[in-house]
Each structure stands twice: as structure tokens, then as C-alpha cells.
Amino acid sequence: MLIGFGYDVHRLVPGRPLVLGGVEIPSKRGLEGHSDADVALHALMDALLGAAGLGDIGTHFPPTDPAWAGANSLDLLRRVVGLLAEEGYRPVNCDITVVAERPKIGPYVPAMRERIGAVLGVEPRRVSIKATTNEQMGFVGREEGIAAYAVALIAGR
């Protein structure tokens, strides 16, 4: 078994939907990015790719490529799972931490776990999603952005 780690951060801006863990969350601001800017899934994809030694999401889905403009990160995650399968790997579990002052994501975690688990091909109980604040410190504390960390375990080969 192999383990990978991922991190992502995006700026909060008005006029964009807020998508975290594949779930749209009501908010006056969303995350700025080339795709839907889902920091939770971006961190997870980097963790999965890193575990398999396959680089990072910027390598596979460059922000300069118009093909990925506005992409749904659940679709990108499906592609990452496909890349793992081509190399003989499969996801086992993942653990994601979202760092944001608001909104509170607790009510949305069950849906996130279901959606991510379905794409990874694992039971939702194998998908851990936690949230914390930055205690009003730094860019996250000033509510300028949201960050996420992820670890993922893969098996195979």
C-alpha cells in the first residue's frame, strides 16, 4: 500500500458557486479557479496522484488548457481514479481536512462522503472529511480563501 498527501488553496470571490467535496454549498462567495476550484477534491487528487507517483493535478489538468475550464472536479477525480487503475492501483481510503472560517460544512459532509466514495469505488465510511477554522489568522482567517489538506491510501501492483 502507498500513501499520498495533497494540499490546495483558492481565493474566495463573489459571483462563483462554492463547491466543496463535490457538493455546492450556499454562499455569497465561491472559489476562484480554472475549474470549479473545489479545494477538497483538488487536494484529494494530488494525494492520490502522489501516492502512485503520477505527479499532480496541474500536470494532468493544466490551468492553461481550455479543455478544463469550468470542469467539475468530480469528473476530474474520475479521471484520476482511471489513471490509477491504468497503473494497477485502486483507492483504499482518504482523509480530507477543509480549513475555512465559514461556511460551516458539517451539514454537507454526508453528501460529500457519498459522492467521493462513489467515485473512488469505496464505502462512504472510507472517506473522512473534517473541517476546522484558522482561528481568524492568515488569509483563511481573514476569509480571503479556503484551504484543504488530504491524505489517501492506495493499493495494488
Curated annotation (Swiss-Prot):
- Residues annotated to bind a divalent metal cation: D8, H10, H42
Q: Where are the transmembrane segments?
A: none
Q: Which sites bind 4-CDP-2-C-methyl-D-erythritol 2-phosphate?
A: D8, V9, H10, H34, S35, D56, I57, G58, T132, T133, N134, E135, F139, R142
Q: What's one Pfam family here?
A: YgbB
Q: Name one GO molecular function term.
A: 2-C-methyl-D-erythritol 2,4-cyclodiphosphate synthase activity
Do you know which InterPro entries this protein is assigned to? MECDP_synthase (IPR003526), MECDP_synthase_CS (IPR020555), MECDP_synthase_sf (IPR036571)
Q: Where is this site: Transition state stabilizer?
A: H34, T133
- Name the pathway: Isoprenoid biosynthesis; isopentenyl diphosphate biosynthesis via DXP pathway; isopentenyl diphosphate from 1-deoxy-D-xylulose 5-phosphate: step 4/6
Q: What is its EC number?
A: 4.6.1.12
Q: What does this protein do?
A: Involved in the biosynthesis of isopentenyl diphosphate (IPP) and dimethylallyl diphosphate (DMAPP), two major building blocks of isoprenoid compounds. Catalyzes the conversion of 4-diphosphocytidyl-2-C-methyl-D-erythritol 2-phosphate (CDP-ME2P) to 2-C-methyl-D-erythritol 2,4-cyclodiphosphate (ME-CPP) with a corresponding release of cytidine 5-monophosphate (CMP).
Cofactor annotation comment: Binds 1 divalent metal cation per subunit.
Class of this enzyme: lyase
Check the record and name the HAMAP family matching this protein.
IspF
Q: Which reaction does it catalyse?
A: 4-CDP-2-C-methyl-D-erythritol 2-phosphate = 2-C-methyl-D-erythritol 2,4-cyclic diphosphate + CMP
Annotated GO biological process? isopentenyl diphosphate biosynthetic process, methylerythritol 4-phosphate pathway; terpenoid biosynthetic process
Report the cofactors: a divalent metal cation
Supply the name of the protein. Answer: 2-C-methyl-D-erythritol 2,4-cyclodiphosphate synthase
Its family?
Answer: Belongs to the IspF family.
The record's listing under CDD domains reads: MECDP_synthase
- Write out the entry's keywords from A to Z: Isoprene biosynthesis, Lyase, Metal-binding
Q: What does the annotation say about its assembly with partners?
A: Homotrimer.
